[in-house]
Swiss-Prot record:
A GO cellular component entry from the record: virion component
Keywords associated with the record: Coiled coil, Virion
Predominant place of localization: virion
Entry protein name: Uncharacterized protein R161
UniProt lineage: Viruses, Varidnaviria, Bamfordvirae, Nucleocytoviricota, Megaviricetes
Localization per record: Virion
InterPro entries cross-referenced by the UniProt entry: DUF5847
Length: 433
């Protein structure tokens, strides 16, 4: 009876765990992928086994024990640098949070960084473990989900009132234009690195010295705020550009191995093409909204009689259809935005894991789509093999072949076949070996 079996090693939290192994330039490398679904704590699930441990407890106990192996381990987490060194994030929070945030709390308590050397150090608590952030998306400020949420809120307000306000629609166009400009700045700098990487001047910065890169990512760079003068806004814009160039320069140029570089640059090129396609969709959506505004203006004095009533302007039925279509278009754009965000973070992690000779045993705790991308790139491009996995619809040999056949990340996640936040690693090697 598995619910009472203390010999079964089950972990509450990850929806799946996979172990991959491969060789890079004669160095054997192993990576463990802990796959998370970011859901509110009240909707979380867990293992039936009463002996199952929550993931943060399992990791802490494992990190304490791996000193016996004599190996150095590198633990990465889907977290931003500014959150790691922000003192507010280090304060004790006694309230139980989602699984990934419980891991983040553990991470913050043991993370060690030397600002003078700009270097992550091994932990005082877990001497055989180096802790690393993995999420650079906010620095590239392609993380525009808040802006899409703002648009959704505006559309929902109009939907509730069944009324299209041209001023609100103009505001939606401005927000989409803001997103477009943020994406454009990323594409422009990516193009500059592709054309002539040596000619790009990159200011040296230390991400972990800056707890906050900029005050509000949702403010259009061209807008002046009442409490900020032009010079302050210019400094803020330049700081964003410095961070953007700093991280993109790492992704394009900071490599020892030419083969790793060439393969990850292909991933970057595809990522840039995807963002360009997204830009075209944003432009079409802006044009659609502008056409609706024109139609509202042209029909505002038009009166239409019905059998039971009358209305001015666009009919209530057409209004509902227009708003519903806009909500669908924004949802498509927001989903595409998430996928593009994934690419920057994942290439950043893979560059470090693959190109650094001193990183041989890695563990990363991230969302399941990130893990799917790691599996896809490692298996297809670098001949890594999935050696162990908690859940899979296929045996290991067929699983690796199946990953090679797929490009859609959601399909790779689906190969697990279960989304319960419980993973069994009874048959995995001990101590992350």
């Amino acid at each position: 009876m598995t619910t009472l079996d203390k010999n079964i090693v089950q972990i509450n939290g990850p929806v799946n765990i996979a172990r991959l192994e491969g060789q890079i330039n004669g160095f054997n490398k192993v990576v463990y992928l802990f796959m998370d679904h970011h859901i509110p704590v009240q909707f979380q699930t867990e293992c039936d086994n009463i002996f199952a441990r929550d993931v943060q407890t399992f990791l802490a106990e494992s990190f304490r024990n791996i000193g016996e192996t004599g190996l150095m381990y590198d633990f990465f987490i889907e977290e931003r640098p500014e959150s790691i060194i922000n003192e507010d994030s280090k304060t004790t929070n006694s309230r139980k949070e989602g699984y990934i945030w419980e891991v983040v709390k553990m991470f913050n308590k043991v993370f060690k960084f030397d600002p003078k050397e700009n270097k992550v150090m091994s932990s005082n608590v877990f001497e055989n473990v180096r802790f690393h952030y993995a999420d650079i998306r906010e620095y590239i400020y392609l993380d525009t989900l808040n802006l899409y949420n703002d648009i959704r809120n505006l559309l929902q307000e109009m939907q509730e009132n069944n009324f299209m306000d041209p001023y609100i629609l103009e505001h939606i166009v401005n927000i989409l234009s803001n997103i477009f400009e943020k994406n454009k700045s990323v594409i422009d700098i990516m193009n500059s690195f592709e054309k002539n990487s040596e000619a790009n001047s990159v200011n040296k910065i230390t991400p972990l010295k800056y707890p906050k890169v900029y005050e509000d990512t949702n403010i259009p760079l061209t807008n002046k705020e009442p409490n900020k003068d032009a010079s302050t806004l210019e400094k803020q814009k330049n700081l964003r550009t410095d961070y953007l160039k700093y991280f993109l320069n790492k992704l394009y140029n900071s490599y020892k191995d030419k083969n790793i570089k060439s393969k990850l640059l292909l991933e970057l090129r595809q990522l840039k093409n995807n963002i360009t396609n997204l830009q075209n969709k944003i432009t079409k959506t802006m044009d659609n909204v502008k056409k609706i505004i024109e139609e509202i203006e042209q029909s505002k004095n038009k009166v239409t009689l019905t059998d039971y009533s009358f209305f001015m302007g666009i009919s209530p039925l057409e209004t509902r259809i227009y708003i519903a279509n806009l909500i669908n278009q924004i949802s498509i754009l927001a989903t595409a935005n998430i996928i593009e965000n994934i690419g920057f973070m994942d290439i950043f992690f893979l560059r470090r894991f693959l190109d650094k000779d001193y990183i041989t045993n890695a563990i990363i705790y991230s969302g399941s789509l990130h893990s799917a991308n790691y599996m896809k790139i490692l298996v297809k491009e670098f001949d890594f093999k999935v050696t162990h996995i908690s859940k899979s619809q296929y045996p290991i040999d067929k699983l690796n072949d199946s990953i090679k056949e797929r490009n859609n990340l959601a399909e790779i996640v689906y190969l697990a076949g279960s989304y319960t936040q419980c993973s069994d690693i009874t048959n995995f090697p001990k101590n992350f070996q």
